[in-house]
A protein has these predicted regions:
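Residues forming the flavin
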Residues: 1-239
Length: 239
């Protein structure tokens, strides 16, 4: 099923390029990729560039246009730190589908339901398992490892510690090291519109916005699981 005939991708990481390239190779129009990062040297981005896919580096989507369906988006250039807009110049691009990629989040639901406590990892801005309620370990994506080489290395180390052994089958595996460029984390992207006059959605399916999360914090919620339930962010089929 083709989502749109004029597709645009908005991203802060490399994974959006996989979808853009896949559509392009099937003859489906990819108008552009809007990337909030200044650059990426990963192989998949270089492939997209070699195919002629237009990339707007250090830009953000500030508005969408259309009645009952998407017809255009407006983008503007970001400052170097990503906290403000670099200029008042606006670019309008025709499209009928906007795909978004904000990076991966560890699936920690079962861990927290078992009584486990989370910690926030600053370097990539994710919540990962911290205090375990029983004899268990978390490996792979649920522990915040998303590249295959990291998954194998960290899984091996975790199993060695947990089982008190010196070697695992993982040690004999040979994996090509990923050259994926890190995502850029900006919690609330700047806009040319007044804060409060727009709805900066965090969860499109549940209609949860950044304003809802701020309200939850103002009400005294601190645990991410409490904030989630108060705002419905990430609940239901999002899980």
């Amino acid at each position: 099923v083709i989502c749109g005939k004029k597709n645009i991708f908005f991203t802060n990481n490399d994974t959006a390029y996989e979808s853009a390239i896949s559509l392009f190779k099937k003859g489906i129009n990819v108008k552009a990729v809007i990337d909030i990062r200044e650059k990426s040297d990963s192989s998949i981005v270089k492939e997209a560039e070699s195919l002629g896919i237009k990339i707007y580096w250090s830009h953000t989507v500030v508005d969408t246009h259309g009645y009952k369906k998407l017809k255009q988006i407006s983008i503007m250039e970001l400052s170097k730190d990503g906290q403000s807009l670099a200029s008042s110049n606006k670019i309008i691009i025709n499209c009928d589908c906007l795909g978004m990629a904000g990076g991966w989040t560890p699936a920690v639901h079962l861990f927290t339901q078992s009584g486990g406590k989370l910690k926030f990892r600053e370097e990539d801005q994710v919540f990962i398992p911290n205090k375990y309620p029983s004899e268990q370990i978390s490996i792979g994506s649920c522990n915040g490892d998303f590249e295959l080489d990291k998954i194998i290395k960290n899984s091996s180390n975790s199993l060695k510690d947990f089982l008190e052994i010196n070697k695992t089958d993982f040690d004999d595996l040979s994996v090509v090291t990923s050259n994926e460029t890190s995502k850029k984390n900006i919690w609330l992207l700047p806009s040319n519109k007044v804060i409060g006059k727009t709805k900066p959605f965090v969860d499109y399916q549940n209609d949860a916005t950044a304003k809802d999360i701020k309200l939850a914090l103002r009400e005294g919620f601190r645990s991410i699981e409490h904030v989630k339930r108060y705002t419905t962010t990430g609940m239901g089929t999002d899980q």
